[in-house]
């Protein structure tokens, strides 16, 4: 799996076991991702932070 980095068009190959790509957004600015990368389990959203996860190459 390859996930986008925060600075397009760069991406990285995920290590074994981290088979989701994710975008992390601040709820206050939910259009601009704060962090992107590979993760094993999609984190739960909180009052301040929203996560969007997906499982195909460079889908974040």
From Swiss-Prot:
Which is a GO BP term held by this UniProt record? killing of cells of another organism
Cellular component, GO, one term:
membrane
List locations, semicolon-separated.
Secreted; Target cell membrane
One GO molecular-function entry: toxin activity
Alphabetic keyword roster? Cardiotoxin, Cytolysis, Disulfide bond, Membrane, Secreted, Target cell membrane, Target membrane, Toxin
**InterPro entries linked:** Cytotoxin_Cobra, Snake_3FTx, Snake_toxin-like_sf, Snake_toxin_con_site, Toxin_cobra-type
Main localization category: secreted
Q: Which Pfam family is one of this chain's hits?
A: Toxin_cobra-type
The record's account of tissue expression is: Expressed by the venom gland.
Q: Which Gene3D superfamilies match?
A: CD59
Q: List the disulfide bonds.
A: 3-21, 14-38, 42-53, 54-59
Q: Origin, by domain of life? A: Eukaryota
Q: Further remark, if any?
A: Shows very weak hemolytic activity.
Subunit composition?
Monomer in solution; Homodimer and oligomer in the presence of negatively charged lipids forming a pore with a size ranging between 20 and 30 Angstroms.
What family does the database annotate?
Answer: Belongs to the three-finger toxin family. Short-chain subfamily. Type IA cytotoxin sub-subfamily.
As for what it does, the entry says:
Shows cytolytic activity on many different cells by forming pore in lipid membranes. In vivo, increases heart rate or kills the animal by cardiac arrest. In addition, it binds to heparin with high affinity, interacts with Kv channel-interacting protein 1 (KCNIP1) in a calcium-independent manner, and binds to integrin alpha-V/beta-3 (ITGAV/ITGB3) with moderate affinity.
Q: What protein name is recorded for this chain? A: Cytotoxin 3
User: What organism is this sequence from?
Assistant: Naja nivea (Cape cobra)
């Amino acid at each position: 799996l390859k996930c986008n980095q925060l600075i397009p068009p760069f991406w990285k190959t995920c290590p074994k076991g981290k088979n989701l790509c994710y975008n992390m957004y601040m709820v206050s600015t939910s259009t601009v991702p704060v962090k992107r990368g590979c993760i094993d389990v999609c984190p739960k959203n909180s009052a301040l932070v929203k996560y969007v996860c997906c499982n195909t190459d460079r889908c974040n």
